[in-house]
């Protein structure tokens, strides 16, 4: 794993989040940008930009997660934590766990309300970051991983499935009316829309939204950006400056 590999991921993500990766009529600029960390949370310079390597030999099952929770939960309001190891439950991202008790609602997410961000003490990697497997990291700059960034900032999948437990509300599953809801089917770029209105037309399209699985993963919509901005403003652990 090299700085160059990670920089490729950063460069792609920044183009997607700025709406400049592809000529997409619905893509917008989120004003969110990522960069590789050069210092740790104590202000010490990292030997390799973007990388904090930890040698653990051959850890027992569960030891890696315990070590991360105790030593490697860097301030999530300053640093996007991404851990790479095959011992921590695969490639995954987690929705925000907390929200300020100020009347703000992020539909579809179940969060604990707190009066201030200072009340929150993060104790688990699942509250603050993203996990990747060793094998997955080597394709990180080829696209698709923006899905995990979107999940981290409160976006929801755009697929309808009777098995997901996510309700179909007002013709939508992700609470963003400017995204297509597609029907679960074969793993492919080509998708078709889903509706509970049997008279509604079916639209066939090549998917490009970051929350479409098996997508070109090149764009965000306006309402998705509004949702992420709401999360950044109100959800401790996601409150970047």
Label every PLM stretch briefly.
Residues 128-220:
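The catalytic-center signature of Zn2+-dependent metalloproteases
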Residues 4-11, 15, 143, 147-151, ...:
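Solvent-exposed, polar/charged alpha-helical surfaces in well-ordered, non-transmembrane soluble domains
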Residues 30, 76-78, 126-128, 206-207, ...:
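Residues that flank catalytic or metal-binding motifs in active/ligand-binding sites
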Residues 20, 40, 87-89, 137-138, ...:
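Acidic glycine-/aspartate-rich tracts in secreted/extracellular proteins
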Residues 24-27, 121-124, 202-203:
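Short, conserved catalytic or adaptor-binding loops enriched in Gly and charged residues
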Residues 215-241:
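Pan-zinc metallopeptidase signature
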Residues 65-160:
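Active-site-proximal segment of zinc-dependent metalloprotease catalytic domains
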Residues 1-78, 86, 233-240:
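Propeptide-to-catalytic entry region of secreted or membrane-anchored zinc metalloproteases
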């Amino acid at each position: 794993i090299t700085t160059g590999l990670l920089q490729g991921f950063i460069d792609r993500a920044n183009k997607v989040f700025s709406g400049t990766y592809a000529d997409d009529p619905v893509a917008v600029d989120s004003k969110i940008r990522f960069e590789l960390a050069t210092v740790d949370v104590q202000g010490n310079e990292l030997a390799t930009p973007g990388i904090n390597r930890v040698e653990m030999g051959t850890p027992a099952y569960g030891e890696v997660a315990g070590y991360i929770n105790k030593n490697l939960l860097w301030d999530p309001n300053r640093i996007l934590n991404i851990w790479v190891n095959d011992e921590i439950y695969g490639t995954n991202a987690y929705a925000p766990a907390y929200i300020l008790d100020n009347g703000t609602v992020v539909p579809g997410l179940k969060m604990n309300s707190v009066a201030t961000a200072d009340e929150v003490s993060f104790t688990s990697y699942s509250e603050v970051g993203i996990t990747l497997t060793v094998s997955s990291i080597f394709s990180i700059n080829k696209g698709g991983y923006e899905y995990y960034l979107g999940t981290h900032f409160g976006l929801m999948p755009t697929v309808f499935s009777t098995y997901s437990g996510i309700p179909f509300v007002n013709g939508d599953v992700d609470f963003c009316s400017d995204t297509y809801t597609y029907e679960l089917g074969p793993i492919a770029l080509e998708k078709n829309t889903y509706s509970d209105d049997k008279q509604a037309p079916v639209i066939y399209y090549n998917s490009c939204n970051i929350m479409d699985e098996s997508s070109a993963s090149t764009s965000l919509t306006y309402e998705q950006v509004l949702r992420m901005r709401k999360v950044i403003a109100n959800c401790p652990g996601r409150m970047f400056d």
